[in-house]
Swiss-Prot record:
It is found in: Cytoplasm. HAMAP family: IF_1. The lineage of its organism: Bacteria, Bacillati, Bacillota, Clostridia, Peptostreptococcales. Pfam families: eIF-1a. This is Translation initiation factor IF-1. One of its GO terms (cellular component) is cytosol. SUPFAM superfamilies: Nucleic acid-binding proteins.
Amino acid sequence: MSKEDVIEVEGVIKEALPNATFQVELENGHVVLAHLSGKLRMHFIRILPGDKVTVELSPYDLTRGRITWRKK
């Protein structure tokens, strides 16, 4: 899967789960499980419930995603 295949959507963190996994409510109302991308882990970016984030979804599984950006 290449970078052109991913779907980028905005969302809000609903709940923090173990192992850097989060429940994210997307703009369209769907709730997905998302994990932190490598760069966010590497730079110790803190993500808390209520933060606005950008999530990349795979077209093959729309229930899981990767958090790639935290809005300021």
